[in-house]
Amino acid sequence: MDITRDDIDAAARRIAGDVRRTPLLRIAGRELGVDCAELWLKLEHLQVSGSFKARGMFNRMRADVVPAAGVVIASGGNAGIAVAYAARALGVRAEVFVPASSSEAKRARLAQLGAVVTVRGASYADALAASLDRQATTGALLMHAYDQREVVAGAGTLAAEVEADAGVPDRALVSVGGGGLIAGVCAWFAGRSRIEALEPALAPTLAAALGAGCPVDVDVAGIAADSLGARRIGDIAWSLARRHVAASHLLADDAIRAAQLALWHGLRLAVEPAAALPLAALATRAVVPRPDEKVLLVICGANVDVATLA
């Protein structure tokens, strides 16, 4: 299931006109209280649709023929929003299945982007089963939030941009839910950068898989569950992460929240909890870089109510 740098280069060409080349903010570590030479913040919260997910969703749609039935996905979070955004931009129909537990605000945003929003079941698993049934019935192109080759290759394009802008970081800190993001980063930087996974303690998909020796279901809760709410690490991510991720760190909700507020008060970056995990790992000293290191923090999304950052 390897994704190659050639796959990522092809994805970058495919989606160049659809997504933003987001800024890479380079600051001294001391600006955020970290003892390292430089922090490189890849600002994917400024990406179209509000997260890195747009890269993979555009790549999936551009790489395949989208049938008249359009596309279908199960997601109440950033992936669904990215699919709705990409489908509208490309003029295709999108149906997003969400569980009853999804927020009204997210459903409203999906509808505002032009998606057909269908509520099915109490959990993501229920919504996923319904989306698979719909795909089988209609022939729509099935989109997955993180476990498709085109989606992972799309995510990897942000790592390619980092290297083009600044070189290869000594260390890359990446938030993990289903694993599409870290899979893309692994595919690009494997063997050249120390890649570390950051997970909420209440949603430890990769840590659980590493402990069990294979992907397993986990219970998901906590502050970052909206965007890191997968119950199991993806197969593609597992294939790459078990070989190329140096460590997985679990972070408490209070540390994630403190880092989210620090990014707002210190740099005026309004980001979702998932995007704050890299800084939380540094602030709690779960990750301790060498003083001469250049450390990449992937700021993955902006699915946040700014009123909560006051």
Can you describe what each PLM-predicted range is?
Residues M1-A310:
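PLP-dependent amino-acid enzyme catalytic core
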